[in-house]
Regions:
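Phosphate-binding site of ATP-dependent enzymes
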Residues: 175-245, 268, 295, 299-301
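Conserved metal-phosphate-binding beta-hairpin within the catalytic cores
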Residues: 277-314, 340, 344-352
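Glycine-rich phosphate-binding loop of ATP-grasp-fold ATP-dependent ligases
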Residues: 144-190, 218-220, 241-265, 313
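A short catalytic or substrate-binding loop motif that flags glycine-/basic-rich loops and adjacent residues
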Residues: 151, 200-202, 212-217, 285-288, ...
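Peripheral (often C-terminal) accessory segments that flank ATP-dependent C-N-forming ligase machineries
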Residues: 327-420
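N-terminal beta-alpha lobe that positions the nucleotide/phosphoryl donor
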Residues: 50-53, 61, 67, 71, ...
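ATP-dependent carboxylate/phosphate-activation module, predominantly the ATP-grasp catalytic core
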Residues: 213-279, 306-335
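ATP-binding N-terminal substructure of ATP-dependent carboxylate-amine bond-forming enzymes
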Residues: 1-101, 404, 408-419
């Protein structure tokens, strides 16, 4: 296996950082197909290390085949590109992801239904694509979240962007929000579906999914499913969420801390997560594919399997002298010597009057994000989320005292700021 083809949207370039480097260390020839070319980000995310980078706005299979007539393995960095991968694999004589598997893995509603059909229903949150208000009766006055059936929690788009990845306390609050915001055509529009240009123009609808409270923390694995459809556990990580409310009907919950876990997690949770993944891999006959999840909660329900490399894999590689990716790719394991904490900085909100020296932050900054300016006159929001285009401020700490170090860095920054 010498020729690697990577399918990646421009917005997913951050997941290529160190991944391409790891492949090159093993002497693979790497071709990246992306939908956009931005010179300023090219070197930052490691694309300069690829042998070729081809721009194909619509990921047209015929055009990709003309340029790249052969490949030994394909990695999709976004699940909505799995259908493209499955079509290419037929031409290349590969069988890692079938067209059927790609369809299941790239649509949340189809994934939930499939899991129920193969006996994994107890792990799947209640969900439905609502086309009438009565469809929401299934939640019995419980909270639920509205999501596109494709994509992830950082990409909102279109008429209903103010619904996507937001939670509602119950059906009544959701209907009230629709009325207050002149979104009465929601159910009719959801029958027809929507198109996202930046998701390869795949038609999707909006799904209502049982709200799983992540403020108490959830656990997930990074895994590599090998050529025998065996699930190889790489390491566990914990996710912690923060919940905000912008008014009485709608709330938002987003990740603010992700920590790699040293050792194992609770046995029952381990057994259930690995059973879920093993069953799925065997039933769909998945091969040579990464997963960044699924994320499991204390009630043993899950969401978002994320069948692709995750950002934490690049972070782990970076804080371990770029030794992790080559090990994963060659041995399907990860010998982690240096664990990490990634967290969104949460600061006291308000208008900044003065700020001291912050140059020390450079060594902790997530280099894949543009650090917001904290300067006299700038405003610090009440909550800092990764989806916030104006104030996304994550830091990375690693080593034995990584937790305490992160707390110290944030406290030092907070103490250096005065407010009006």
């Amino acid at each position: 296996m010498n020729n690697v083809l990577i399918l990646c949207h421009r917005r997913g370039w951050n997941k290529l950082t160190n991944f391409i480097l790891g492949l090159k260390k093993l002497d693979y020839r790497v071709t990246v197909v992306s939908d956009e070319y931005l010179t300023g980000d090219f070197n930052q995310f490691g694309l300069d290390k690829a042998d070729e980078v081809c721009i194909n706005e619509n990921f047209n299979v015929e055009e990709i085949l003309l340029h790249t007539p052969t490949a030994d393995i394909i990695y999709s960095i976004s699940e909505n590109l799995l259908p493209v991968q499955s079509q290419l694999e037929k031409h290349y004589g590969l069988n890692n992801v079938s067209e059927y598997a790609a369809e299941i893995l790239s649509h949340k509603d189809k994934f939930d239904t499939y899991c129920r059909d193969i006996g994994l229903g107890k792990y799947v949150p209640d969900s439905i694509v609502p086309i009438t208000p009565s469809d929401l009766n299934m939640f019995n006055d419980r909270a639920f979240v509205i999501k596109p059936t494709i994509g992830n929690g950082t990409k909102r788009y279109g008429t209903y962007s103010n619904l996507e990845y937001y939670g509602f306390n119950n059906k009544a609050d959701f209907l009230k929000y629709l009325k207050l915001n002149n979104l009465d055509s929601f159910f009719d529009d959801n029958v027809e579906g929507f198109i996202k240009p930046n998701f390869n123009n795949v038609k999707y609808r909006l799904i209502a999914q049982e709200f799983l409270d992540g403020t108490k923390g959830s656990h997930a694995p990074y895994t590599y499913i090998d050529h025998d459809s065996e699930v190889n556990l790489l390491w566990w990580f914990k996710m912690e969420m923060i919940k905000s409310k912008d008014h009485t009907e709608r709330f938002e919950e987003q990740v603010y801390k992700v920590s790699s876990i040293e050792g194992d997690i609770e046995e029952e949770l381990t057994n259930n997560i690995l059973y879920f993944l093993t069953t799925l891999a065997k039933e769909l006959q998945l091969k040579n594919i990464f997963t960044s999840g699924p994320e499991f909660f204390s009630n043993l329900k899950m969401f978002d399997i994320n069948p692709r490399p995750g950002n934490g894999m690049n972070i782990c590689d970076a804080v371990n002298d770029n030794k992790i990716w080559p090990q994963i790719l060659s041995e399907a394991k990860a010998d982690i010597q240096n664990h990490y904490v990634w967290q969104q900085v949460q600061l006291k909100p308000g208008k900044v009057k003065e700020v001291g020296d912050t140059s020390y932050l450079t060594q902790y900054a997530d280099g894949q994000r543009t650090r917001p300016k904290i300067e006299p006159g700038s405003t610090i929001p009440e909550f800092s989320f990764i989806v916030d285009p104006d104030f996304c401020f994550p830091i990375i700490t690693s080593g034995k005292n990584r937790v305490e170090l992160g707390e110290t860095v944030i406290r030092q920054l907070q103490d250096s700021i005065s407010y009006y």
